[in-house]
Design a protein with these regions (language model features):
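Non-catalytic connector elements of ABC transporters
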Residues: 40-42, 50-159
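Internal alpha/beta loop-helix hairpins
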Residues: 1-61
Length: 159
C-alpha cells in the first residue's frame, strides 16, 4: 500500500473500488475490499435506529457506528471492525460498544498479542492488542473480558 497514491481493487475481473490506500483500508465500500486488504471482523446486523450521524444496531450486541448514510430502520447491513481498532480489557469502562467476550485463542507476538474472542451469542472478533505497561494483566485462554471500540472505527457496509 506504500507503492501508489491510488490503488484499484478488482473482483472477478471487475474494478470495484479505486481510492487512496488509507481510504481503501479505513473506509472500504464493500466487504470484498475490506477482507481483501487484511484481517477484519464482520458482524451481520439490522439497523435499529439511524440519525445521519450514527447507526445503532439492536439485538444482543447493541453496536453504535458513526455513519453519513441515512439507512432505513430494519435494513440489513454488515459491520466491519479492524483488529487494531478493538481494545480488550478485564473490566467494563462504561462506554459505548462494550461487549463481554471469552478468549477463544491467542498468539503472543512480542510487540502485540493477536486474540480471537467470542460473545455469548457466538459472534467472533479478531483483535490485536499492542504490548504496553498496563495495570490490566493480559487475558488468557478461556478468560472473560470486554472488547471496546469507538463508533468512528466501525465500518458500515451495505453489501
Amino acid at each position: 500500500m506504500t507503492l501508489a497514491g491510488r490503488i484499484g481493487i478488482m473482483d472477478a475481473g471487475q474494478l470495484v473500488q479505486v481510492d487512496a490506500p488509507r481510504s481503501l483500508y479505513e473506509r472500504p465500500k464493500s466487504s470484498f475490499v475490506a477482507d481483501f486488504l487484511g484481517t477484519i471482523s464482520f458482524v451481520d446486523a439490522i439497523v435499529a435506529s439511524c440519525d445521519k450521524t450514527s447507526i445503532t444496531i439492536g439485538g444482543d450486541l447493541n453496536i453504535c457506528a458513526a455513519s453519513d448514510d441515512d439507512l432505513p430502520v430494519g435494513s440489513a447491513v454488515k459491520l466491519a471492525i479492524r483488529p487494531e481498532k478493538i481494545y480488550l480489557s478485564r473490566t467494563k469502562n462504561g462506554g459505548v460498544n462494550e461487549i463481554e467476550v471469552v478468549v477463544e485463542d491467542l498468539a503472543y507476538l512480542g510487540f502485540a498479542t493477536n486474540y480471537r474472542v467470542k460473545t455469548a451469542s457466538g459472534q467472533m472478533f479478531k483483535l490485536q492488542q499492542q504490548q504496553r505497561r498496563s495495570l490490566d494483566a493480559p487475558l488468557s485462554w478461556g478468560e472473560t473480558g470486554y472488547v471496546h471500540f469507538d463508533p468512528q472505527d466501525v465500518i458500515v457496509l451495505k453489501d
